[in-house]
Amino acid sequence: MAASENPRDRAVQHMFNRIARRYDLLNRVISFRLDNRWREQAIQSIWTADNPLILDLGAGTGDLTFSALKTAGGGRIVGLDFSLEMLRLAQRRSRSVPHGEQSRFVLGSGLRSPFRDAVFDGVMSAFVLRNVSDLALFFDQAFRVLRPGGKFVSLDMFPPSKGLFAGFYGLYFYHVVPWIGALLAHDRAAYQYLSESVRTFHSPVMVAEILKQAGFAHITWRRFLCGAVCMHVAERPNPSGIPA
């Protein structure tokens, strides 16, 4: 399946294919090993049914998927990603992690989700939004595949609030991280892109507004690490009032 007709999307797809094998290690280094804790909190916010069917948008190597299965035990998760190399690693990991058999992975784009309407109890995404060329369309698709009453949760990185930490973060993320990428992944350009994607991304308030425009309700967000990471939670309204 072609990644996208958008040149930016194709470039991002090729970049993630290049860095797939080192991506998880670099996430740990870049986040000071806090990313797993943030994922657990995202999972807790969305796991509202006993045996839910969850979509992991931009699943990558399966970090969020496997964290959810380990944390919650029950449920089934479908991971969607447009990087073939990432999904190959996810599929391989699924054979050796707890409850890995409750996951499956699909090659495709979150901008053209291949799933039917209102099929998932929840949709989750971690560190994906900044890499999406059309965030409004991405949220529209997430809304479409959610059942009424289902929740959407996303984690992503943002420029932190002003202050001493913001200065340290700017030095670390915009200057040190590309060097770490060059050292560990042998791809400085990829991590230069990731740094720039944070610098130029929407504010958390704007992300919440785009979620609202897509039809979501009960939108909240929570800041971690002085605002360097935010978790947005939103719900597809359920006009009938019947639980999803």
Tell me the role of every PLM-derived stretch.
Residues 53-113:
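Class I SAM-dependent methyltransferase SAM/SAH-binding core
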Residues 1-22, 173, 184:
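N-terminal, positively charged/glycine-rich alpha-helical extensions of SAM-dependent methyltransferases
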Residues 136-148:
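A short glycine-rich, Lys/Arg-flanked "PGG" loop and its adjoining helix->strand segment in the class I
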Residues 23, 123-124:
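Hydrophobic beta-strand segment of the Class I
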Residues 208, 214-244:
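Core SAM-dependent methyltransferase catalytic element
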Residues 32-51, 67:
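Conserved alpha-helix/loop element of class I SAM-dependent methyltransferases that forms part
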Residues 155-210, 214, 220:
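C-terminal alpha-helical "lid/dimerization" subdomain adjacent to the S-adenosyl-L-methionine
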Residues 111-122:
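A short acidic, Gly/Pro-enriched loop at the edge of an enzyme's catalytic core
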